[in-house]
Amino acid sequence: GCCGAFACRFGCTPCC
């Protein structure tokens, strides 16, 4: 899974 602010910054969506 891709969760966390760092994940969002890496273009991982949707963000948890």
From Swiss-Prot:
What UniProt keywords apply to this chain's record, in alphabetical order? Answer: Disulfide bond, Secreted, Toxin
Q: Which cysteines are joined by disulfide bonds?
A: C2-C16, C3-C12, C8-C15
Report what the Swiss-Prot or TrEMBL entry states about this protein's PTMs.
Contains 3 disulfide bonds.
Q: Which residues form the signal peptide?
A: none
Taking the first listed entry, what is the main subcellular location of this protein, grouped into a coarse class?
secreted
Localization per record: Secreted
Picking any one GO molecular function of the record gives: toxin activity
What domain of life? Eukaryota
- GO cellular component terms? extracellular region
What does the record say about tissue specificity? Expressed by the venom duct. Is present in all duct parts with a highest content in part 2 (proximal of the venom bulb) and then decreases in concentration toward the end of the duct.
Instruction: State the family named in the UniProt similarity comment for this chain.
Output: Belongs to the conotoxin M superfamily.
Comment text on domains: The cysteine framework is III (CC-C-C-CC).
The protein depicted here goes by the name: Conotoxin tx3d
Classification of source organism = Eukaryota, Metazoa, Spiralia, Lophotrochozoa, Mollusca
